[in-house]
Amino acid sequence: MIKQFQTELAGKTLHVEIGKYAEQASGSCMVRYGDTTVLVNATASKSPREGIDFFPLSVDYEEKLYAVGKIPGGFIKREARPSEKAVLTSRLIDRPIRPLFPKGYRNEVQVIATVMSVDKDYAPDIVAMIGSSIALSISDIPFGGPTGSVNVGLVNGEFVLNPTSDQRAISDIDLVVSGTKDAIMMIESGANEVTEDQMLDALMFAHEEIKTIVAFIEEIVAEVGKPKQEVQLFAIDETLDMEVRVFAKDKIVTAMKTFDKMERNERLDNVKKEILVHFSKQYENELKSIVEVINSIIKEQFRYMITHDKVRPDERALDEIRPITSEVGILPRTHGTGLFTRGQTQVLTVATLGALGEVQILDGLGEEESKRYMHHYNFPPYSVGEAKFLRGPGRREIGHGALAERALLPMVPSQDDFPYAIRLVSEVLSSNGSSSQASVCGSTLALLDAGVPIKDMVAGIAMGLVKENDKIAILSDIQGMEDALGDMDFKVAGTDKGITAIQMDIKIKGIHKDILKDALEQARVGRLHILDKMKKAIDKPRPELSPFAPRVLKMKIHPDKIRDVIGSGGKTINRIIDETGVKIDIDNDGTIFIAAESQEAVEKAIIIIENIIKDPEVGQNYTGKVIKIMNFGAFLEILPGKEGLLHVSNIAHERVNKVEDVLEVGQEIEVKVMEIDQQGKINLSRKALLPKESKAENTKEEKA
């Protein structure tokens, strides 16, 4: 049976259709907001997946180029691997729903959101997130939602719900929030140095709207929702659990109290081996269950130490930040480098400057066609002491790179002020938590070292949370164990004036305003501390670019002159490139960017272009080059791309019978512009510059 539902969201109609499409999926809905339409399907396996100790949830956000009336490029003409935007949106969908499945649920669950149509004023990512919650909620899959999701902007000091394309362009906040009716589950935001209070107000504004969406979804579930399936949850035998705890608890607690991550891991591994050997005969077929009990003990003891003893594994105070060192100028031939070390987390970020023609071309569903500022994050296995195959960047690496990119973006100078493409690559050399925020700090150092005139320095910090009933501990600068065993990973980046990026993921069923407020304030204090440490290495951009960086200059010409610079079939611009070795990029408004390895090459290209766009003037003298000889005269190039006719009667005072007797191709002579007619044709005279006693037969002495 086909059912339709609708509600108002930000003054616009959100329309949901159920029962018409994909009837074999466990839960399916077509969600339309404006003209943006997304089909979302949720399915689950009938039985648990064997041999795993995690919940196998997969989320895919599919961008179909037909949604914006495009045919994919390339030879195959079909969508290839997901774009960066698609990967990031898949993560946005995944993060708020993952904590809401039952503990011990091991059935495979797949959510697929397919973008069918896109209206630029109605963001498809928000529609897909709402649709995913609906599909799971109406299905028979045991999901503890529903959740709601919104986008919040800050335009002229006012919060705007689900801003339009034009509003997003001028907004000081780009905030995506997901949550249940009770609490916030996920935050993703970029911002233009907003204060902690402004960000908190934006989050509370978002949550009020989320409650409305959740109520709407609950109405849908009440009418068309399926009964939830009875599922088999993974559980450990109580006797085994008790025996392992009695034998192992004290050993694990002793092993955990170690400052160094590698030493702690080694001691815990040795304890695990001892425990497994001890129970190997008694529970020969339950070794995986024993490992799970061990991991549970580690988690419980960690959380008890934090909430009751107020002691962290490395003996830091809850708000204490690990020792920090910063260096710049590490690599001799790169354009800029920054090495940021915080405890056992170390990131080397390298900045590369390029011509604007080297921007990243985006072929997706968004309005952006290119990206001038890029950040790539690499997490090799040696950074955590492992040996694995090297593969392309995964979703985590793409997500961390995008977060660091977003954190610095408001500080990057405009194209007019700094006409370069900028690429940053963060190599994680050692990781014990907070590597993405170390990448933010390394990026700032590398940009300053490269001489990029960023508006201000940016630092990042990762905050954690451990919540046991009414006991709450907020942790500054979390390390790996605290990230893995805690309840929250709350990353905050910004300047000393305000926040530029936020990302929050939680493992519990939401957090409330007071926790968010305290975490934001504690993050602010930590961020300022980190900035002070970074300033000891470098506190302003280098006055000069690296000698190995390209030189880029820009010039402005009248848009009507663009065709003259490019020439027929690109002949003129290619000739300039061949002669000077520069790279040239031309905007439609007549702005020309010229890049080369040397200043001399750039200046040479500018002179050539200036001559090309220069218009001949009547009465002015020019050195012309003979390019073609005809019976009635000769054609001369007097400026690049500018040709004029020297009629045979204007070659000399005397009569010239054959032009070839006086001129030859390639010869350079002085001529005067006598006339430019209405069609732009130029008439030249050599005779006007010759004394009357001059003899035509002597003129070949002038030939070059």
Curated annotation (Swiss-Prot):
It catalyses: RNA(n+1) + phosphate = RNA(n) + a ribonucleoside 5'-diphosphate. One of its GO terms (biological process) is mRNA catabolic process. It is found in: Cytoplasm. Gene3D superfamilies: GHMP Kinase, N-terminal domain, K Homology domain, type 1, Nucleic acid-binding proteins. GO terms for cellular component: cytosol. Its cofactor is Mg(2+). Belongs to the polyribonucleotide nucleotidyltransferase family. This is Polyribonucleotide nucleotidyltransferase 4. It comes from Alkaliphilus metalliredigens (strain QYMF). The lineage of its organism: Bacteria, Bacillati, Bacillota, Clostridia, Peptostreptococcales.
